[in-house]
Amino acid sequence: TCVAALNLDDGKTVWTHEDSWGASYASPILTKIHDRDVALVLAAGESRPAHGGLLVLDPRSGKLLSRFPWRADIYESVLASTPLSISHNQVFISDCYELGGVLLNFSKDFTIQPAWKKRFFGMHMMTPQKIGNYLYGFAGRNIPDTQLKCLNLKNGEILIEDDVRWKEGQRTTGLF
């Protein structure tokens, strides 16, 4: 099972969605796209070749409304950054291994088109934070390739890149 909906009162399964992409580390979210309730699932289980991406499901039935492939061609890659609802028709998803981040535009029939792609704004185990028209997050997989970055949502331009250095046993320099 890739994802399942459970009844909050008794814990029984309401529906399951089977998909070759499989389950991932990313938490599904509920949001609205064009005023319709949807569940966004970033799916990427164990598979050779590696495959996965964004599944858009009806949260009442589990029916697939749309899908967008977005996963590196590396077996060990994971999708762990939770999808981020940006507006009534935009969602940001991320892969840190090869692809980076992508802002997705949704039409009313749930056709998905990338607004922009940014290779070096790939989140690994975190979801970026949206503040105004900007995303802030630690892009990269681990030290030493991780940087604090700020990205303009309108055009995908990276505005800030800070090589935050970690010191063993001390606070992060430059942040606190």
Where are the regions a protein language model picked out?
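Noncatalytic, solvent-exposed loop/strand surfaces
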Residues: 1-176
